[in-house]
Curated annotation (Swiss-Prot):
UniProt cross-references to NCBIfam families, sorted A to Z: cobA_cysG_Cterm, PRK06136.1
Keyword presence, Lyase: yes
Keywords assigned by UniProt, alphabetized: Lyase, Methyltransferase, Multifunctional enzyme, Porphyrin biosynthesis, S-adenosyl-L-methionine, Transferase
Descriptive protein name: Porphyrin biosynthesis protein HemD
Species the sequence originates in: Ruminiclostridium josui
Name of encoding gene: hemD
Known role: May catalyze sequential reactions to synthesize uroporphyrinogen III from hydroxymethylbilane (HMB) and then precorrin-2, which are intermediate compounds in both vitamin B12 and siroheme biosyntheses.
Catalytic activity: uroporphyrinogen III + 2 S-adenosyl-L-methionine = precorrin-2 + 2 S-adenosyl-L-homocysteine + H(+); hydroxymethylbilane = uroporphyrinogen III + H2O
Stated family: In the N-terminal section; belongs to the precorrin methyltransferase family. In the C-terminal section; belongs to the uroporphyrinogen-III synthase family.
Lineage: Bacteria, Bacillati, Bacillota, Clostridia, Eubacteriales
A single GO BP: cobalamin biosynthetic process
Amino acid sequence: MEHGFVALVGAGPGDKGLITIRGAELLSQADVVVYDRLVSQEIIKMIPTTAEKIDVGKENKFHPVKQEEINHILLEKSLEGKKVIRLKGGDPFVFGRGGEELELLYENNIPFEVVPGVTSAVAALCYGGIPATHRDFCSSLHIITGHAREGGQLSIPFHELKELNGTIVFLMGDSSLSYLMNGLINAGMEKDMPAAIVENGTRPNQRKLVATVGTLEQKALEMEIKSPAIIAVGKVCSLSEKFSWFMKKPLFGTKILVTRPKESSGTLVEKLRQLGAEPVEYPCIEVVPIPQNEKLYHACENIREYGWILLTSKNGIQIFFDYLNSKGLDARVLANTKIGTVGSQTAKALKEVGLISDFTPEIFDGRHLALGIAERVGENEKVLICDAAIASDDIVNILRSNNIKFDRVPLYNTNYINENSNKVKKSIVHGELKYITFTSASTVEGFIASMKDIPLESLTAVCIGNKTAEAAKKYNLRYVVAEKSTIDSMIDKLLEIGGGNIYD
């Protein structure tokens, strides 16, 4: 068997947007991914589901998997002919032991590549509003490890650092803070020299402390600063508040529970993240196509009988057209059939399969879709309703009351799931979660089913529409309703939620 390949990929300090294009490309091709604690969950989610994931869990002062063992894991997996990605927080060669990991690969003639990563020494400062250099304050940057090798002692040339008058950055130095600050003071640095700590830099739970060399240690104790944290010393730290941008985002640090199915949550999660929020993905439902769907089979066999097809979700569109394709059919069989969609996102999904919706109501719900179709359907035209197995009867009732012929074909079941419910329950009980988003009545039902005996009074639900709000009201949840039944409108409601409009 031919040898495999190993890539040391810098994952950056946490924000998934900071991994390089090359790093993401290699990660998408991985057979095996070896990663540790400093790699954020957002980047771990980028690992292909087909790849073997090996968590070596290295933490400050606690290395459950020794470095020598990690080196051998990389070697063994590559000798199996696999493409191995060693995913490392920050940059592999900035105190990342990347050189140590390459030595064994080099000795065994294993092909390798190193992809640089954005180091926290610069990125965490940037997200804290601190420029690493500024011509009015300094012209050099010095990155120092604040963590001694196992069995060794730190030996930092404080006098030389002090004389350079540059920005000093200590990585992994939170446990050595007293030694570092006293070392600088004893070397003659003024106690009022600006200094800062950025904890969890570039992440939604980032915290920042700006003080002086003389006060940083005490204030860090008071704030209970924890790893990962970087320490910066220099006049540039005085610019932190002036240049702060990340922590001034409108939803910065706000934990928001997202209950959509995994395959549908991406847009909402990404938009929340861009606003500084910390979205917590907790899919409460999963969409499962109905197997051996006889009703769908007969509908597709007689598809030309229908003057209109009504599609009520993105999932329904995907399942319907996947089924058509599986039978050797495509959109051409719908040449004489009009299509109605329940909302803008459903219409967009239809456009992605090459078709344009003939009708989408201004108010995005089944009732208004049916009312619009009742006005448009021709005499003796038959309507095909494609929706979920458990769905509102609004469309059926309105078509029936207007004497419109129809067939209803359920395309999928909506199952409740509760993965990681204990973690979410703890966050709710401890008051860490403030808001929860519901994009359908079924997400409300699924959430409630997984939260038995958990007090929910501290949560405010943001509902995509009135039907969803009715479900929230049924369980006495505090809620607000988006002005329009869209993700963007839900986000607008989150941005204004402090102003009220909360119905008990």
